[in-house]
A protein has these predicted regions:
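Alpha-helical scaffold domains
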Residues: 1-206
Length: 206
């Protein structure tokens, strides 16, 4: 990817500050990245195979834009994920973790989980993990699934995380409920009424 020719120091500094200086950036704007993805990813889809060496190479680079390449590449290639790839996705979630990559990886994980029978149990396990990012993915993986949302699994995952003081967990709980309320508002109202004493104010406001 021709990122190194697009270095912009001032923009890179601004992007890094936005991410609380957790990562170094090259300074490639989102619109520019999107144009690059549009150029390269259609050919990648023709292979019908995920290039995990490419994923690893990009993920191991220091600059954050390369991790963005990975998550958008996997989003473009998600229908080619295999059941054993869940362990690879887990690795990406727990390394170089922050909301900017994790939230996109949640969608990729969701595309795999809904295809593989029994993988909802993995999400239940993740929802009780000590790693906050695995828990966040478990909470968010059913976003936008509408009638395909497994209400029982969603409820168990949310209940597993009630009482957590972590901002990113409580924010995710509210996000998941708000999203599902667009399709099933009555269920969401009942859930909040039943569990409001254990819910963070942030989750309810969200």
């Amino acid at each position: 990817f021709p990122y190194t020719t697009l270095f912009r120091s001032l923009l890179a500094e601004s992007m890094s500050k936005y991410m609380q200086d957790k990562f170094r950036f090259l300074g490639v704007r989102g619109a520019t990245r999107t144009e690059i993805y549009k150029k390269y990813f259609p050919d990648a889809r023709k292979t019908k195979t995920i290039d995990w060496d490419f994923v690893e190479s990009c993920w191991n680079k220091e600059e954050r834009e390369f991790q963005y390449v990975v998550v958008y590449y996997l989003k473009a290639m998600q229908k080619f994920l295999k059941r054993e790839d869940i362990s690879r996705l887990k690795y990406l979630i727990v390394t170089k973790s922050w909301w900017d990559t994790v939230d996109l990886l949640a969608k990729v994980v969701g595309s795999l989980v809904i295809r593989i029978e029994g993988y909802d149990q993995i999400m239940l396990e993740w929802s009780k993990d000590s790693n906050i990012w695995l828990k966040r993915v478990a909470i968010l993986y059913q976003l936008s699934l509408k009638e395909k949302v497994d209400k029982q699994v969603l409820e168990r995952i949310l209940v597993n995380n009630l009482g957590d003081s972590e901002f990113f967990i409580n924010k995710a709980i509210g996000w998941a409920l708000r999203d599902y309320s667009k399709f099933n508002p009555e269920w969401v109202r009942e859930f909040i009424e039943k569990n409001k004493n254990g819910m963070a104010n942030l989750s309810i406001r969200e």
